[in-house]
């Protein structure tokens, strides 16, 4: 065989080998593309709601002391040189988070003990606001209104005003767009403290970037909303927007009083269905409900999540929003609250858009910020869904 013939044979074999290699690569690419398409389709089907808005949310009802997770508690203790009851994350979780089978309000309230201990200094309060805000930002929250009761942070000598100033400092140190709501508390012998909270709210009130509203929280069944008429008359006189916890431990009548006082938002409002007239009043006045499913299940406001009325209210045209309440104690996130509504009620992307739109419209902030939030959340887009 000549050198030329040998060269030609080698070239033929190489061309054949190349064709086989190319063919094999094409087959592999085709298989990979098919698998990738299937995986993407499955992922989209499983989480099309999250994809619709890139996992971005608004939390209007979030208590600072109820949002202290294990990592945050450990950081607050280290910063202040405090000793926690255990070094074990697993054991600390038991102190901070209610068990899945929470059977009593005492089990729930016990989880506030360590956060209350950690939030009695300006440093602790400042860092708590910053850490909680950073934490929820990492979970997809783009705007939040963090509420706390200044009178709960005076046990070690800090004044209500110093507590507010510390919280404002923490707000400045986070990149999350957030505001503060100051809570007055239901109870005995604290009228002066509540009045001071209202006066300080007026002093520090801004349209955005600080204190934007006041609230009334605490044992609703023991201390009826109707008892606080004068307190909120003063808030109205001073031009302070307010939300009131109502329709949670007490029934629909509590919500009626809150609306009569001038509340534009109701914390929870779960039980308005008990009185059709109150349902009609909520719709007529355009009042927004701040609903918190996991919280309401754990405090036994509802017996079963399948009975939760959020979707019924949404379908009835009531302005409802989805929130966390006490995310650290409940072991939840706002993304998880949306997933729960998907699981139990087949929440659609369009319904999520409505919930987020309601949250933007009800937020205690400026129109400019609301427009920014609408843009971030793509609320003007039409969401297509094949869900039934």
Regions found by a protein language model. Name each.
Residues 13, 26-28, 43:
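Detector for intrinsically disordered, low-structure N-terminal pre-sequences
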């Amino acid at each position: 065989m000549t050198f030329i013939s040998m060269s030609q044979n080698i070239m033929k074999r190489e061309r054949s080998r190349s064709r086989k290699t190319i063919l094999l690569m094409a087959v592999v690419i085709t298989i990979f593309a098919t698998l990738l398409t299937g995986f993407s389709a499955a992922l989209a089907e499983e989480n099309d709601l999250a994809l619709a808005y890139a996992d971005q949310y608004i939390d209007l009802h979030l208590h600072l002391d109820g949002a202290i997770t294990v990592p945050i508690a450990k950081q607050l203790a280290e910063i202040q040189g405090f000793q926690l009851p255990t070094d074990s994350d697993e054991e600390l979780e038991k102190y901070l988070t209610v068990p899945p089978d929470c059977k009593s309000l005492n089990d729930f309230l016990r989880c506030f003990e360590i956060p209350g201990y950690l939030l009695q200094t300006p440093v602790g309060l400042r860092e708590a606001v910053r850490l909680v805000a950073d934490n929820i930002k990492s979970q997809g929250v783009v705007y939040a209104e963090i509420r706390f009761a200044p009178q709960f942070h005076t046990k070690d000598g800090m004044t209500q005003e110093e507590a507010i100033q510390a919280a404002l400092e923490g707000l400045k140190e986070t990149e999350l767009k957030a505001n503060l709501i100051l809570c007055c508390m239901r109870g005995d012998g604290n009228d002066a403290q509540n009045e001071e909270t209202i006066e300080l709210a007026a002093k520090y009130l801004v349209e955005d970037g600080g204190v934007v509203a006041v609230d009334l929280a605490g044992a609703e069944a023991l201390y009826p909303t109707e008892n606080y008429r004068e307190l909120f008359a003063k808030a109205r006189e001073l031009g302070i927007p307010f939300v009131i916890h109502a329709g949670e431990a007490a029934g629909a009548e509590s919500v009626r009083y809150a609306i009569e006082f001038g509340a534009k938002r109701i914390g929870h409002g779960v039980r308005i269905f008990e009185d059709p007239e109150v349902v009609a009043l909520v719709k007529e006045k355009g009042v927004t409900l701040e609903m918190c499913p996991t919280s309401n299940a754990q405090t036994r406001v509802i017996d079963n999540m399948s009975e939760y009325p959020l979707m019924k209210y949404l379908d009835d045209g009531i302005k409802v929003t989805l929130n966390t309440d006490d995310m650290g104690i409940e072991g939840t996130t706002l993304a998880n609250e949306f997933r729960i509504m998907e699981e139990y009620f087949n929440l659609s992307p369009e319904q999520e858009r409505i919930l987020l739109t309601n949250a933007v419209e009800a937020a205690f902030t400026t129109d400019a910020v609301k427009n920014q939030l609408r843009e971030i959340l793509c609320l003007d887009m039409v969401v297509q869904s094949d869900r039934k």
